[in-house]
Amino acid sequence: MAKRDFYEILGLGKNASDEEIKKAYRKLAMKHHPDRNPDSKGAEDKFKEAKEAYEMLSDPQKRDAYDRYGHAGVDPNMGGGGGGGGFADAFGDIFGDIFGQAGGGRGGRGGPQVYRGADLRYNLEITLEQAAHGYDTTIRVPSWDSCETCDGSGAKPGTSPINCTTCGGHGQVRMQQGFFSVLQTCPKCHGSGKINPSPCTACSGAGKIKRNKTLEVKIPSGIDDGMRIRSSGNGEPGMNGGPPGDLYVEIRIKQHAMFQREGDDLHCEIPISFAKAALGGEIEVPTLNGKASFTIPEGTQSGKTFRLRSKGIKGVRSGYAGDLFCHVVVETPVTLTEKQKELLREFELLTIEGGSKHSPQTKSWKDKVKEFFE
């Protein structure tokens, strides 16, 4: 049975910090500890599973190997002295050697594998105004930097890495799997061809340290929710001289207090008074670029929509501005004075006398009700 992903076990993403990993493990350990669940075999299995995931992800060197090669990078039973993988694994390694290893690995049969660095993702939340007009900002991204103590060698200062004793410095081992003789990434040096008998204490032999990197991001005007901006070369560093991965900044737009966005169009509700709806007149409305106005006709009903062309958002791809749709909401007056109530009662009587002339929808509705009960 295939082993579960260590990050999935802890309920975390691959960008999780060391503190988040420790916190998630403690929570699961408390929940599934055998002493708290003496009669549950399932709880014991989950406890062991969480413990293994924590042991791997809390160690920088093991975590780096797992991030790059999956379980094969941290399982001593997968590779090394023969045996191991099944028929599908054999073919996977054959085709990997011909076309390049998964994840961007490449290299000759006699040398260490070269791997492209992993891509990173960063979620950035911005306002609707920033999305409409464009926005320049800086972000801090968790990333790996070369260890300053050992200059990236992974070896304790004053010592040097030596050729891996398992692969002889080639970064690969040849394994016999049935009728096939195949090359696999060395499980001891993880393809680097080197090992550190005296690892650097600052980076635990990884040659790199995780820290926040500050980057400038230019967000183009008109960008929409869910779009991504690629920052080439700002992902994780490659291995054995491989190129770095890319950083993808995924945009999330905050909900606006007034406008709702649909593509490049904007929608908003415009409350107007009962008198304004009846008499008509000019309405002033806000837009993302200042104020605008339009005229509503006499007798405007609640729910009527007015379209203001090119008052929406200029599309990041099309270059054309969308429209602003204003949905009128006729507001019923509240907290009236006696004088106002008196005038409204008089108005109501005049309206009744006028019949369908003043309230055609009310007359129509009353006729339908009458027919319904007859």
Swiss-Prot record:
Q: What is known of its domains?
A: The J domain is necessary and sufficient to stimulate DnaK ATPase activity. Zinc center 1 plays an important role in the autonomous, DnaK-independent chaperone activity of DnaJ. Zinc center 2 is essential for interaction with DnaK and for DnaJ activity.
Which is one GO molecular function term here? Answer: ATP binding
Show the NCBIfam families listed in the entry.
DnaJ_bact, PRK10767.1
Q: What name appears for this protein in its UniProt entry?
A: Chaperone protein DnaJ
Tell me its family: Belongs to the DnaJ family.
Keywords (alphabetical) are: Chaperone, Cytoplasm, DNA replication, Metal-binding, Repeat, Stress response, Zinc, Zinc-finger
Q: Which SMART domains match?
A: DnaJ
Tell me yes or no: is GTP-binding among this UniProt entry's keywords: no
What this protein needs as a cofactor is: Zn(2+)
> Which superkingdom does the taxonomy of this entry point to?
Bacteria
List ligand-binding residues for Zn(2+) 2.
C164, C167, C186, C189
Where is the protein found, in the record's own terms?
Cytoplasm
User: What role does this protein play?
Assistant: Participates actively in the response to hyperosmotic and heat shock by preventing the aggregation of stress-denatured proteins and by disaggregating proteins, also in an autonomous, DnaK-independent fashion. Unfolded proteins bind initially to DnaJ; upon interaction with the DnaJ-bound protein, DnaK hydrolyzes its bound ATP, resulting in the formation of a stable complex. GrpE releases ADP from DnaK; ATP binding to DnaK triggers the release of the substrate protein, thus completing the reaction cycle.
